[in-house]
């Protein structure tokens, strides 16, 4: 909680009292990441480089054990994951879990899918997006021809019809970064669990590159 005072604005001492526990945790997580030299880079080829302090990876390991695994125990969540992972499967979830010989491997598959997806979404939303916006990391990307093509897509064009500014560029890029079916979440989820599980305490910085081919978006 050493960063808790950083959350309080000097002119608004009731600020923290108006936040729920999850909001406070998110803000503390980001402050801890910045304090330990978390950083993000992106080039004009849309490749994202995330530089993780080992302490943040250790925190995510704790999050897996103390939140994600407990949350996964809920049967309703397992049903939702089953539908998401196997959208074309017609066998009812209840019938699958009755097959004892199949059940254990099936549940492990769902669990790994859930943890990878949750880690990727949390990191992208809580750390990467915020860092990029705060530090203007994507400024050169926003000026590239590839970003111009993406900004002209039908789903993004209305935002630029209203206002053309850096805020709109950041908003559009955030949409791309945090698209659960997009290349960044998909590519990060494929490798993040191994990175978290094998991180070494006090190893300074661990870097990972995430491909975000703009051709997929256009």
Swiss-Prot record:
Pfam families, alphabetized: DUF5410
Organism for this UniProt entry: Rickettsia prowazekii (strain Madrid E)
Name under which the protein is recorded: Uncharacterized protein RP363
InterPro entries xref list: Uncharacterised_RP363/RP364
Superkingdom classification of source: Bacteria
């Amino acid at each position: 909680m050493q960063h808790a005072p950083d959350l309080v604005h000097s002119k608004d001492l009731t600020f923290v009292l108006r936040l729920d526990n999850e909001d406070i945790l998110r803000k503390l997580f980001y402050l801890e990441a910045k304090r330990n030299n978390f950083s993000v880079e992106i080039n004009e080829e849309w490749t994202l480089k995330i530089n993780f302090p080992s302490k943040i990876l250790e925190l995510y390991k704790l999050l897996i054990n103390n939140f994600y695994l407990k949350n996964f125990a809920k049967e309703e969540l397992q049903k939702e994951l089953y539908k998401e992972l196997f959208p074309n499967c017609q066998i009812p979830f209840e019938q699958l879990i009755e097959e004892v010989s199949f059940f254990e491997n099936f549940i492990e598959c769902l669990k790994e899918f859930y943890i990878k997806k949750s880690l990727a979404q949390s990191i992208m939303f809580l750390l990467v997006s915020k860092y990029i916006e705060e530090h203007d990391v994507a400024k050169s990307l926003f000026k590239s021809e590839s970003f111009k093509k993406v900004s002209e897509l039908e789903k993004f064009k209305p935002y630029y019809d209203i206002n053309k500014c850096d805020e709109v560029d950041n908003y559009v890029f955030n949409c791309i970064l945090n698209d659960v079916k997009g290349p960044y979440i998909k590519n990060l989820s494929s490798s993040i669990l191994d990175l978290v599980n094998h991180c070494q305490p006090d190893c300074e910085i661990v870097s990972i590159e995430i491909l975000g081919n703009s051709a997929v978006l256009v």
